[in-house]
């Protein structure tokens, strides 16, 4: 099996640039088939995908809010050895005050 694979690789590498380009030139003749394929992909993949995404957003907007878990100040979490280079130095770059606690606890929002 390895010998057959090696033989195939050596054949492909041994071809001239012109010979490698010939099999690919047949793709230019199927323009009608290509347009039909993209039209089918649009109708049967893209539009249903957008519909499923819209349904997901609708269902998530009607979802109940969860209560925040109680804050427990574990010593191995939220260690700040030096301040962050943005803002007040205590908030992470994508800090969300509703979800992410600071080292001292949740912010009152």
Curated annotation (Swiss-Prot):
Name of the molecule in the record: Cytochrome c oxidase subunit 6A1, mitochondrial
TM region positions: 35-59
GO biological process: mitochondrial electron transport, cytochrome c to oxygen
Lineage: Eukaryota, Metazoa, Chordata, Craniata, Vertebrata
Stretches of the chain forming a coiled coil according to its record: none
Topology Mitochondrial intermembrane: residue spans: 60-109
Gene assigned in the entry: COX6A1
SUPFAM superfamilies in alphabetical order: Mitochondrial cytochrome c oxidase subunit VIa
PROSITE patterns: COX6A
Membrane topology reported for the UniProt record: Single-pass membrane protein
InterPro entries: Cyt_c_oxidase_su6a, Cyt_c_oxidase_su6a_CS, Cyt_c_oxidase_su6a_sf
The keyword Cell cycle is annotated on this UniProt entry: no
Gene Ontology CC: one annotated term: mitochondrial inner membrane
Cellular localization per UniProt: Mitochondrion inner membrane
Family: Belongs to the cytochrome c oxidase subunit 6A family.
Pfam families: COX6A
All ranges on the Mitochondrial matrix side of the membrane: 25-34
Organism: Oryctolagus cuniculus (Rabbit)
Function: Component of the cytochrome c oxidase, the last enzyme in the mitochondrial electron transport chain which drives oxidative phosphorylation. The respiratory chain contains 3 multisubunit complexes succinate dehydrogenase (complex II, CII), ubiquinol-cytochrome c oxidoreductase (cytochrome b-c1 complex, complex III, CIII) and cytochrome c oxidase (complex IV, CIV), that cooperate to transfer electrons derived from NADH and succinate to molecular oxygen, creating an electrochemical gradient over the inner membrane that drives transmembrane transport and the ATP synthase.
Keyword tags: Membrane, Mitochondrion, Mitochondrion inner membrane, Oxidoreductase, Transit peptide, Transmembrane, Transmembrane helix
Oligomer and partners: Component of the cytochrome c oxidase (complex IV, CIV), a multisubunit enzyme composed of 14 subunits. The complex is composed of a catalytic core of 3 subunits MT-CO1, MT-CO2 and MT-CO3, encoded in the mitochondrial DNA, and 11 supernumerary subunits COX4I, COX5A, COX5B, COX6A, COX6B, COX6C, COX7A, COX7B, COX7C, COX8 and NDUFA4, which are encoded in the nuclear genome.
First and last residues of the transit peptide: 1-24
GO molecular function: enzyme regulator activity; oxidoreductase activity
Pathway: Energy metabolism; oxidative phosphorylation
């Amino acid at each position: 099996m390895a010998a057959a694979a090696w033989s195939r690789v050596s054949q492909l590498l041994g071809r001239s640039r012109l010979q490698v380009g010939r099999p690919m030139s047949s793709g230019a003749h199927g323009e009608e088939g290509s347009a039909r394929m993209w039209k089918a992909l649009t109708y049967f993949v893209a539009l249903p995908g957008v519909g499923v995404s819209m349904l997901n957003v609708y269902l998530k907007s009607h979802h109940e809010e969860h209560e925040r878990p109680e804050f427990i100040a574990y010593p191995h979490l939220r260690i700040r050895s030096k301040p962050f280079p943005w803002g007040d130095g205590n908030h992470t770059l994508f800090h969300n005050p509703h979800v992410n606690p600071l080292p001292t606890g949740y912010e009152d929002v």
